[in-house]
Amino acid sequence: MSTAIAQQKIRIRLKAFDRRMLDLSCDKIIETADQTAATAIGPIPLPTKRKIYCVLRSPHVDKDSREHFETRTHRRIIDIYSPSAKTIDALMKLDLPSGVDIEVKL
């Protein structure tokens, strides 16, 4: 029987409406992981979610006249293998934009 070494992994999921802010945040996270000698894999792009809202243009009549709005949620995943305590501290102190939603799973 071979012994499998359990490898620690941090999975970071990022979501944002603005793709450029999301990519900048991914670059900062990967750069921080590389500086602390951890291995970062990613950013792995996930499918973009589109939410479409249909609104009547007129407040009273003309149901045939409608307007469509949409929001696009861009998502990325970054995996960090063999993190040290220094890596986790550096990631906690990282200053990221407020428009980016971050989920960290250990």
Swiss-Prot record:
Transmembrane segments: none annotated. Gene3D superfamilies: Ribosomal protein S10 domain (3.30.70.600). GO terms for cellular component: ribonucleoprotein complex; ribosome. It comes from the Bacteria. Pfam families: Ribosomal_S10. Keywords: Ribonucleoprotein, Ribosomal protein. GO terms for molecular function: structural constituent of ribosome; tRNA binding. One of its GO terms (biological process) is translation. InterPro entries: Ribosomal_uS10, Ribosomal_uS10_dom, Ribosomal_uS10_dom_sf. The keyword Manganese does not apply. Signal peptide: none annotated. Involved in the binding of tRNA to the ribosomes. Part of the 30S ribosomal subunit. HAMAP family: Ribosomal_uS10 (MF_00508). NCBIfam families: PRK00596.1, rpsJ_bact. Belongs to the universal ribosomal protein uS10 family. This is Small ribosomal subunit protein uS10. It comes from Parasynechococcus marenigrum (strain WH8102). The lineage of its organism: Bacteria, Bacillati, Cyanobacteriota, Cyanophyceae, Synechococcales.
